[in-house]
């Protein structure tokens, strides 16, 4: 007698299941996300196997030989920087980004470059083979050695991987794949989780460097279950304004390199090109004689970046002053205004305050505090800051200036780009000032000291 399939209700947000329908998911608390699905019977030979090729045994950690993991350069220098030097055999990378941002273009360029020395396979679930060929032709990419498979059925993809034994595989995208073992539609939580698990298992067993393309939700998170990001080795986000020519790729998680590393690309007629000096791009339109502008030296992974911080402080025309930020934390702005009022004696309670990090950069580190304050003061007084000045440092609630990481590297980058002055935390002052002959460094320990320096007239 055939076994009756059991009906379950699965959450489209977190993937949790419930035996009966409920308005609110009992796992993540979201409303109206439970959908009816059928639980497929588990076969005798379970698909849940170890990702290791052989059966693992208990052994002493001291007996395990730790070898240096070899890196395979992708041919894209900025992508290699984010990955930690290149692709690792058996690594699974998840690349997410908004529609039209250039994910497929970047990976097609990468595959074409790696095909010169590695056996590659591009699996397209969103475009036909003809569409991929047209895109490669438009980008003027060499297609010799690039193997292409237009398929979304997981079992067919697994067969192709076993037959062709590729070394590098791109799956575009994981949300279009489906497995016959799951009854739900492609793109559902269960399908995404199962397909990602099967691909990850094959990548580990066969030593394939695999890149999965992921869609994002309207909130900017990668679509599908959260376990997808835990399952892979590296999570990359492709960011940028579609109205701008510049794109940024950021590592959120990386088991084989540093997280929070940043790579910058420029979109051209022939695809994406790496930008070796992004600070020059972010400061292309910078003028130091403009009130409300200050240059911040921020740190993205191992790379110092110079970003212009713009502030506009104006009289409020309503009962509630506006506080808006682009690229900076809005809660941080509210805190800095309170500190400026209490410890700097400058009240902005009746002023609208707008902040912008030029170039579409998103800055999350507190080192931006010491650049935001001078920018706001400059706009408030309608007086430019001393010329060729940069700043970085964290400001505490009691008005103290706290040190930040990698102060020496930030100062070297500022001097290299021709800046003459720097306001930094006293603890970040270099031991030997002679190492920076062209940079006058002001070490401050309090907010008031920084304000006094900003009051100096332009030379």
Could you say what each language-model-derived stretch is?
Residues 120-124:
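Conserved RecA-like ASCE P-loop NTPase motor core of nucleic-acid helicases/translocases
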Residues 3-13, 17-81, 88-94, 101-111, ...:
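Peripheral, non-AAA+ core regions of ATP-driven protein-machinery
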Residues 129:
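Divalent metal-dependent catalytic cores for phosphoryl transfer on phosphate-bearing substrates
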Residues 98, 125:
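P-loop (Walker A) phosphate-binding loop of NTP-binding proteins
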């Amino acid at each position: 007698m055939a076994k009756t399939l059991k009906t379950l209700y699965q959450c489209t947000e977190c993937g949790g299941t419930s035996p009966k329908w409920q308005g609110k998911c009992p796992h993540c608390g979201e409303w109206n996300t439970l959908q009816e699905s059928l639980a497929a019977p588990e076969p005798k030979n379970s698909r849940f196997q170890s990702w290791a090729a052989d059966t693992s045994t208990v052994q002493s950690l001291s007996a395990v030989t730790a070898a240096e993991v070899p890196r395979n350069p992708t041919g894209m220098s900025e992508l290699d920087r984010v990955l930690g030097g290149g692709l690792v055999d058996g690594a699974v990378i998840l690349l997410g980004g908004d529609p039209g941002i250039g994910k497929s273009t970047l990976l097609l360029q990468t595959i074409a470059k790696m095909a010169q020395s590695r056996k590659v396979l591009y699996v397209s679930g969103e475009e036909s083979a003809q569409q991929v060929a047209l895109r490669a032709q438009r980008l003027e990419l060499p297609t010799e050695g690039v193997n292409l498979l237009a398929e979304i059925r997981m079992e067919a993809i697994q067969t192709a991987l076993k037959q062709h034994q590729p070394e590098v595989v791109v799956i575009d995208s994981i949300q279009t794949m489906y497995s016959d073992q799951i009854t739900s539609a492609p793109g559902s939580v269960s399908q995404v989780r199962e397909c990602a698990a099967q691909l990850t298992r094959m990548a580990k067993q066969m030593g394939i460097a695999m890149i999965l393309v992921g869609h994002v939700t309207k909130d900017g998170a990668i679509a599908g279950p959260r376990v997808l990001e835990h399952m892979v080795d590296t999570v990359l986000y492709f960011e940028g304004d579609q109205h701008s020519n510049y794109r940024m790729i950021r590592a959120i998680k990386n088991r084989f390199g540093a997280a929070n590393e940043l790579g910058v690309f420029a979109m051209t007629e022939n695809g994406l090109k790496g930008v070796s000096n992004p600070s020059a791009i972010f400061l292309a339109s910078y003028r130091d004689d403009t009130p409300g502008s200050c240059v911040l030296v921020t740190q993205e992974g191992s790379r110092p970046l110079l970003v212009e911080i713009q502030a506009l402080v104006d009289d409020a025309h309503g009962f509630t002053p506006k506080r808006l930020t682009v690229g900076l934390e809005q809660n941080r702005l509210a805190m800095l205004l309170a500190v400026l009022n209490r410890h700097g004696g400058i009240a902005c309670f009746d002023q609208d305050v707008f902040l912008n990090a030029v170039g579409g950069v998103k800055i999350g580190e507190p080192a931006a505090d010491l650049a935001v304050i001078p920018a706001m003061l400059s706009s408030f007084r309608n007086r430019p800051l001393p010329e060729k000045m940069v700043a970085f440092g964290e400001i505490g609630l009691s008005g103290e200036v706290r040190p930040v990481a990698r102060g020496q590297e930030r100062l070297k980058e500022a001097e290299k780009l021709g800046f003459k002055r720097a306001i930094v935390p006293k603890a970040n002052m270099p031991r030997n000032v002679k190492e920076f002959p062209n940079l006058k460094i002001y070490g401050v320990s309090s907010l008031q000291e920084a304000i006094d320096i900003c009051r100096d007239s332009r030379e």
